[in-house]
Amino acid sequence: MITEVDIHMPLPRALREEAQRKAVANALQISPARVQGMRLLKESIDARRRPICKQLRLMVAVDEPLPPQELPVRHYAPVGEGARRVIIVGSGPGGLFAALRCLELGMRPIVLERGKDVSARRFDLQPVNCRGFVVEDSNYCFGEGGAGTFSDGKLYTRATKRGPVAEVYETFVAHGADPAILTDAHPHVGSNRLPNIIKAIRTSIINAGGEVHFRSRVVALLTDRGGTRVCGVRTADGTEYTGCAVILATGHSARDVYRMLRDMGLLLERKPFAVGVRIEHPQALIDAVQYHLRPGAPRPEGLPAARYTLATSIEGRGVHSFCMCPGGFIVPAATENDEVVVNGMSLSRRNSPFSNSGFVVTVEPEDTDAFLREHGALSGIAYQKALEVATSQAGGGMMRAPAQRVQDFLAGRVSASLPVTSYHPGITPWDLNALLPPSVCSRMREGLVFFDRKLRGFAGEDALLIGCETRTSSPVRIPRDASTLQHPQLAGLFPCGEGAGFAGGIVSAALDGRRCAEAVQQMPLS
């Protein structure tokens, strides 16, 4: 008999196979000798109280051998000569998974990426980290793999109703991801492992007859004579690519793409986003609070670097943590040299002595009305940009970021000294109350005090704020028909993923890319 069993076991006993076998046998009310094999299907940690436990779901073989495990494999048949050509702008998760789905459906994807391939892109991160200079089309936001490649690689998602999440995980594993992402309740790849996975996906696309072009920034959409249907794109070097459809998966930082659409007279919409800071703590502090450790006690065996998720509402606006990076680093995520933007990342082992998270406040469209007359639907981008430029000026240039101890932020004073930080370009003492909008600061102050009651030390003497976090999501939505997924004014244009306002994170963007490819297949040929 092959069955599934859920068990709840304290650590470190949960790490021992024989202890698991006894717990399974007890749950099934059989002798442990009858359990001939077990395989992990899902695991999570229950740290709500002591003792800390693991919740395990196991496939169990009783009185017969356990079938061999078959890891996911993906084979993409070469597309035929007459296959539909689909132009995909952007090679983040939305674009790459759209391309893979096109291949599965017999269409030929033509992927155009403004930045460089992932290996060259990694080299271009050195100037921004070490010399404070951004390579504007090849950085933490732009280039093969998109923003998620070098900003952590979290795969946890709540978007379970948007499509086959398991298919996305299995595709990552088929291209080299650790199979543990199939069983972990909060899967994470790591910025050190994602590049090779992205390269493997590119190889799959090319081997099946697709194309991937780097340093190919799209500057114009090509339309039919009536201007009602898109038929291709033009890149900055003048090359034109034609196809039956254009999937626009350019990410939340491709501001020139929004301006291109606005200048064409296409409808764009304002949407909520969030701004704030990165908050950094010693990882040992977060471990101690989340795992109920005594002062100075090491993290117990079998426990990963602890994480947290915090959220509340203050005066009608959300205040929350964002993209929490246990054992991680704060990185410079600007896309132009006159701005400072911070983000977080972790490597696969999550073994940095620091934890960090975005700590942000919701910005509603009406909060950007000061920019509305000049910028219209792009008022949120103007709001972001103004804050990013001011952040650069406060930091003193060269990607240095303004920073402040949390207790000094609450007291409204510049920090006399700053702790060691993971942010490599460096930090400058500054009163962030004078940098962020007052409506954001007041909610941040109240949120810090509130969250400190839930997570002791969150607003303590070891907590550091680094400004500013502005790229949590796009402040613009590119509208699309709910049924066809095409732009309401331009047939054949499929706004996709996070940059279009329809995703938030790697997995939801990948799912949206798949949906867009499926919608292209359903589109009648003109």
Put a short name on every predicted segment.
Residues M1-K54, L58-F150, K154-S526:
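Residues forming the flavin
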